[in-house]
């Protein structure tokens, strides 16, 4: 797809993303879904995942839990939008197999919460800034499967009842920016607020789910809360901090805890 046709696809992409509001429900109960998070412009890893799990399967799905730009791996010599562009084009080609959630790096810092690093946003022309802002503002925040798995970027909203497209909502902003922790007491005095076990249980009960798959925090344990929460980082940027993982969910199998999900270490499978 050439650049002009890509620009013309903006309204189609927004319509696809807005179809289910901020809470995307995926009703399928067969096949597999690969879940990843925090690609941060790691196109090499994305290409490997697409080639391995999407192209070679007729019904496999992929969910990405946000943070598509910034922190580009030094060995991925490409423009800051490269990985996001690839995903958006894949969404157009496979609208029922590629699902993208919103991360905190995906909201324009000139309109919402400022943050660093944000080389993705700083690299854009005025036209491109408007193009990506409108598309990324339309992304869902939460995705659920019927087998008890829920996905988000940071933490879950405290209630399953939240405004579909109100980006000024405190609940939505806290979902993108906050972290879960098993530490006590819980810190609440920064943009990256901490949520504890009670918050986690309250949200999981509200959404009627058993296991959360999320991203956002490379310093979080891979498994938390008695095997009810998984934190993924898929980019090579944090390889030495937390490893590089994806989760594979069997959509036809009830999931009661993390042991019912396959966690794959891409550092071992894919190498550097």
Give a label for each model feature.
Residues 1-81:
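N-terminal active-site segment of His-dependent metallophosphoesterases
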Residues 3, 7-10, 116-128, 134, ...:
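Active-site-proximal loop/helix segment associated with metal-binding centers of metalloenzymes
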Residues 30-32, 58-61, 68-151, 157-158, ...:
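Active-site neighborhood of divalent metal-dependent phosphoester bond hydrolases
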Residues 35-37, 62-66, 99-104, 151-152, ...:
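Active-site neighborhood of phospho(di)ester-bond hydrolases with catalytic His/Asp-centered motifs
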Residues 40-44, 70-74, 105-112, 157-159, ...:
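Active-site environment of divalent metal-dependent phosphoester hydrolases
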Residues 48-53, 86-90, 202-203:
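A generic secondary-structure signal
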Residues 140-144, 222-224, 243-250:
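Short beta-strand scaffold segments in enzyme catalytic cores
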Residues 229-272:
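Binuclear metal-dependent phosphoesterase catalytic core
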């Amino acid at each position: 797809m050439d650049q002009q046709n890509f620009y013309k696809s903006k309204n189609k992409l927004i319509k696809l993303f807005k179809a289910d509001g901020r809470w995307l429900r995926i009703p399928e109960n067969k096949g597999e879904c690969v879940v990843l998070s925090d690609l941060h412009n790691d196109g090499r890893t994305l290409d490997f995942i697409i080639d391995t799990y999407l192209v070679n399967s007729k019904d496999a799905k992929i969910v990405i839990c946000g943070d598509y730009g910034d922190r580009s791996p030094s060995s991925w010599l490409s423009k800051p939008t490269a990985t996001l562009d690839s995903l958006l084009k894949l969404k157009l080609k496979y609208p029922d197999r590629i699902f993208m959630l919103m991360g905190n790096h995906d909201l324009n810092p000139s309109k919402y919460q400022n943050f660093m690093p944000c080389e993705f946003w700083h690299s854009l022309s005025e036209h491109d800034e408007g193009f990506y802002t409108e598309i990324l503002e339309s992304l869902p925040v939460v995705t659920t499967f019927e087998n008890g798995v829920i996905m988000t970027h940071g933490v879950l909203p405290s209630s399953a009842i939240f405004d579909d497209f109100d980006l000024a909502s405190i609940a939505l902003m806290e979902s993108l920016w906050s972290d879960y922790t098993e530490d006590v007491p819980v810190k609440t005095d920064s943009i990256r607020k901490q949520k504890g076990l009670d918050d986690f249980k309250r949200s999981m009960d509200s959404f009627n789910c058993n296991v959360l798959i999320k991203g956002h925090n490379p310093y979080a344990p891979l498994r938390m809360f008695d095997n009810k929460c998984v934190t993924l980082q898929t980019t090579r940027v944090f390889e030495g901090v937390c490893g590089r993982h994806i989760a594979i969910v069997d959509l036809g199998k009830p999931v009661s805890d993390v042991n019912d999900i396959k966690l794959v270490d891409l550092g071992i499978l894919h190498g550097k």
